[in-house]
Amino acid sequence: MNDNWYKKIIGARTIKTGLATFLTALFCLALNLNPIFAILTAIVTIEPTAKASLKKGYRRLPATIIGALFAVIFTFIFGDQSPFAYALSATFTIILCTKLNLHVGTTVATLTAMAMIPGIHEAYFFNFFSRLLTAIIGLVTAGLVNFIILPPKYYDQVESSINLTESKMYELFELRMRQLLLGKFTKGAPYRQLNQLIDLNQKVETLLSYQKDELSYHKHHDSEWIQLKALTTRAHTNRLFITHLSNLVYLPKDTIITFTNDEKLAILSIAQSINNIYSTGHFERKKQHASLLKMSVKGLDEFDSNQLKSHVIYEILLIYRILDHRFA
């Protein structure tokens, strides 16, 4: 039975957020402190990685202090029944957090200020320092929970996303080659599919950066670094592939390219071979067809009417070379 069945129902980050909220409320109530401010801080402190929680926590704490300070100041001046107290507290909190480069803490600081005002009354110093204490409790509790409980492992998610990326990009390459051979250079170009592919690969690289951060903060086996390096290499190779594929999708308007029958056969053969990679697991080289395209491009002048044709063939050969190195 799959030990990770719970992931289909509830994610690890959701579990950690709930646990951090429970523990934060428990500590605050035990100290007879209002838990709402600590809970707000704890909820936003749970990040995808422990490193992100700690790094952003350093900025959220001073931001929360700023919000609490402005709430006390403007409540003292205008009272807790004045709209000016709310408006000016929010405005000055946002301004100062922005000036001090505390952007990640701006939201929780502003919410803290707004939630504080109705309960301050005349206990200004007590409310300020109690809010400071509860913010620290929320930050520390959430940070420890995120660090200790269910450290995230993104390997399976990354590999699944990479497999999906490769399947789509190989398929899109063959589709684009068929379009070019049919004379569909700009009309009907697969811009949407390409943008989805770029977004998918960006997601992969984001998850890889998360996993790298986690390995830096937790004990790990050398095999995990090896696995991460292999996945990173695949993602970088895919990014190169997508870059050259983009150059084949985004062609100038009114593009017209004439291919010989031999060139068409070579391009189609290479495209089919690339699209078969995902199903077969290997790259079947088409050396004869690749050589034919190399000879074709050598006979073209890059600065005459064949400039675009030369560009297209170069991109096809570069993609072929990327895969040739990858599956060497």
From Swiss-Prot:
The chain crosses the membrane at residues 26-46, 61-81, 84-104, 132-152. Its main location: membrane. Belongs to the UPF0421 family. This is UPF0421 protein SSP0904. The keyword Cell membrane applies. It is a multi-pass membrane protein. Keywords: Cell membrane, Membrane, Transmembrane, Transmembrane helix. Pfam families: ArAE_1 (PF06081). It is found in: Cell membrane. It comes from Staphylococcus saprophyticus subsp. saprophyticus (strain ATCC 15305 / DSM 20229 / NCIMB 8711 / NCTC 7292 / S-41). One of its GO terms (cellular component) is plasma membrane.
